[in-house]
Amino acid sequence: MAVYTDITEDELRNFLTQYDVGSLTSYKGIAEGVENSNFLLHTTKDPLILTLYEKRVEKNDLPFFLGLMQHLAAKGLSCPLPLPRKDGELLGELSGRPAALISFLEGMWLRKPEAKHCREVGKALAAMHLASEGFEIKRPNALSVDGWKVLWDKSEERADEVEKGLREEIRPEIDYLAAHWPKDLPAGVIHADLFQDNVFFLGDELSGLIDFYFACNDLLAYDVSICLNAWCFEKDGAYNVTKGKALLEGYQSVRPLSEAELEALPLLSRGSALRFFLTRLYDWLTTPAGALVVKKDPLEYLRKLRFHRTIANVAEYGLAGE
């Protein structure tokens, strides 16, 4: 469910007068996504996406998100482009919410990606990292090491309701990662949420990246580790080394990882698995019964975390010769 704020046709038509987008012919809510309210608009010019930013999105972060999409599109990356109003502003207001019009991106996300798709994802992620160079607005990653501690403090007391022994396992893991987290690897703007539903394909060709609302400044290789976790495990929890090899080789073909980044990848992958475990755990424990939100299983990412603990070097992810 991704329409938290309803809008009327009259409100929408009035909102659109602030833009040079033609006249509204139809609109409908989009069910996918969990953070914002999204609508697909058809106009006499082009199809558009209307996004109303809900309370979980900080209004002060919106210039970063919208500006980043503009910057990336100007650099040639295929991603949604925020449309300016007639007064030049990117952000408006509708139904009491900050709102923006975004260009419509053709494509669909893949339910069953193959290794060839993972290779394209690696290439696109590296292209995004390179294209983001020169983007001057900064946004720290609130879901890095310090954020993990905050999430765990909120969840620790009830964690064993999800699986017995979690309290004994997770606190030492956070402490270990905090003590060993790399500080001097290449950094820049990362997507931070490049899951399957945020990558569009037309056939086997990647048509674009979407949903930059977790983007922030952090280690570039950390973004690679997020993709390993999101794209390279099967439904039964097994790591698919063929997909991992393809994703890493695709990335390296555009932006080669340094020796230090490759060496850090198992640790970074533990960290990114922990990050999604903790946010899922918090949501699992705090989402009210009957809420129109599908709760995601935190234990999926606990199993990935445990897998990464067994990895001695990046060759085990599929990169031969490392």
Swiss-Prot record:
Documented EC number(s): 2.7.1.39
One biological process term in Gene Ontology: threonine biosynthetic process
Keywords: Amino-acid biosynthesis, ATP-binding, Kinase, Nucleotide-binding, Threonine biosynthesis, Transferase
Source organism superkingdom: Bacteria
Catalyzed reactions: L-homoserine + ATP = O-phospho-L-homoserine + ADP + H(+)
Top EC class of this enzyme: transferase
Presence of the UniProt keyword Cell inner membrane in the record: no
MF-aspect GO terms: ATP binding; homoserine kinase activity
Keyword Transferase in record: yes
CDD domains: HomoserineK_II
Pathway: Amino-acid biosynthesis; L-threonine biosynthesis; L-threonine from L-aspartate: step 4/5
InterPro entries with a match to the protein in the record: Aminoglycoside_PTrfase, Homoserine_kinase_II, Kinase-like_dom_sf, Pseudomonas-type_ThrB
NCBIfam families cross-referenced by the UniProt entry: PRK05231.1 (NF003558), thrB_alt (TIGR00938)
Family that this chain belongs to: Belongs to the pseudomonas-type ThrB family.
Protein name per Swiss-Prot or TrEMBL: Homoserine kinase
Gene name per UniProt: thrB
